[in-house]
Design a protein with these regions (language model features):
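Mature catalytic domains of secreted/periplasmic carbohydrate-active enzymes
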Residues: 1-142
């Protein structure tokens, strides 16, 4: 999922994804995970955890739900971000990394929870330093 909120996998927690909201209607990440496994290649996910321009409460997104209710980042985190990170760390077999991106001013408690989910579900996976608050396994430029 990039900042636009569109998941390039079959997300059960949000319908704005390649299977349910596009004519492609297949899960390319499932196919890629299988192909990487067959060829002995590492596999992982990119996930923009702070920004979501289309989901209420996501950084850069709407501040109200469709029915006009004001929401905070916590709403986005609990209803989209956390469920999707659980999905990508449980539905695709062993993964080698999760590349979080653009933490911005995301509170440390949220980053800690995401890191804990990855560590629990994929204990061998590396986490990018762009998770935020120095909680990743490696640093990257950009």
């Amino acid at each position: 999922k990039h900042h636009d909120g569109f998941a390039m996998y079959d997300s059960k927690s949000n319908d704005f994804n390649i299977v349910k909201a596009s004519p492609f209607a297949r899960d390319p990440m499932k196919e890629l995970a299988q192909a990487c496994k067959e060829e002995g290649l590492g596999f992982g996910f990119y996930y923009s955890h702070n920004q979501d321009w289309t989901f209420p409460g996501g950084n850069g997104g709407p501040t109200t739900t469709e029915d006009g209710k004001e929401v905070s980042f916590d709403y986005y985190f609990k209803n989209k971000c956390l469920p999707q990170v659980k999905e990508i760390t449980t539905e695709y077999g062993d993964i080698d990394f999760v590349w979080f991106d653009t933490p911005g001013e995301m509170e440390k408690k949220y980053v800690e929870e995401l890191v804990a989910v990855v560590r629990k579900n994929q204990p061998k996976a590396m986490i990018s330093g762009r998770a935020g608050h120095g909680l990743g396994d490696y640093q990257s430029l950009g």
